[in-house]
């Protein structure tokens, strides 16, 4: 661990800070706890890049940390050779405070290192950055975004040539490189306007939007059903003050939606997210304005995309006519079942279709896929792993991936992006809602029909928050305890199989026989129980919390709900 007081003094007297930044550091002079939290070490550079609160300090998101991270990334790109520098990087940003300044700072560092830059003139959805990397044949990509985190946060996501987030070996190479670079004296910079004049920086805009949207619109399977209900079918949409504001409505109107109502207060681009406590479509509370509008106009379907427009959440009217949130697990199952049928009806289904999900995503999705002749593969959490699996399957000629999704509201569709994509997902979820509307069904009705057909599956995710400097220690201690003294039963139900994705081992609890899984190298534990329930435990990659996933099934809705309650009570004992 760094000597945080020395690091604090180094920053204070570096001569690299603005007067405001110096003033901010002087204001915490007597607060050792605050100094420690800002300077005890650098933000960890992982496969998702960097994420943190926006303050002055080494363990924070600010222009100095952005430049430093970019210098490390630039060195890794340059190590690939001159051709890689020529292919260059695509850079994008979201609506957050400082996102544009951070993106331009990253562009200046790349240009100073002789790396060609294509930077969006203004904020864009994350999937469009993935698309731009692939479309322009770039070596890499940088996206300044903290996705759905609270307004105090920003982040720095890095992509490689396939348009997916960095694989672990490249992330490790950058992290190693950063240890060699001084944050102030080790960074090259070239003024933005000078780099534009020198031809090292090019601005991207409408032309890239058009190419991206032509790919999105080619994903439509069934315009006829949309046209059939167009006069009565009403959609309410909110971008939560973020990047979906332009392209999602464009996609829905292009699909043939005549009655699209956007939540005006949340169509305002604003990185302080003034109308919501959290701009996360996983939180139903954020949809209160959308529900008001839907009730006013008589809509029964609501879509919301997060600030960088890579994740989408939906709300539909339940049996009593009131709006209920449809979870990411449920939305994915609905969309998968719909797409399999729609692609077959449209003659678009590949010969050997594959479907990808993460290990913590509902097993109902596997049932839907396999019942319909689609092969299901599991990956670790994160779209870089799904992108990697898609690339591998398709390169080997084994089949073609029609959809990939994870329970946290992310869907990857089509072949033109390698990250979660709320623009395309919003389009296809809306097409699906219209198709069911043409049959006189809401998406709530459709979901109940799927439960009757495939089984009463249920899921719940618990977040065990462990804040503070000792949070990481508490997280590690809990994982260690579950490894070294695993439970023989959970809530009175026997554990039948234990799986540890760290080393890829499986243990048959009855015989003690040890086996090997295909997947390994991730800090996740899995307990498979005698009643068919699965419980997974893993530390979050971006926040100080342990995530516990309950994946269960009942003979009917009542038994499913009782199972969720029973296992949720056990989860609460983990922190006692």
Question: For each predicted feature, which ranges?
Answer:
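Gly/Ser/Thr-enriched, mixed-charge loops and adjacent short helices
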Residues: 34-43, 154-286, 292-294
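N-terminal small/polar loop signature for handling phosphorylated ligands or for N-terminal nucleophile
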Residues: 90-153, 256-313
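Short Gly/Thr/Asp-enriched flexible loops that form oxyanion-binding sites at enzyme active sites
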Residues: 102-110, 153-160, 310-329, 365
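Glycine-rich phosphate-binding loop plus the immediately following alpha-helix
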Residues: 159-189, 329-352, 357-366, 422
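An N-terminal, well-structured beta->alpha segment
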Residues: 2-3, 8-106, 195-235, 243
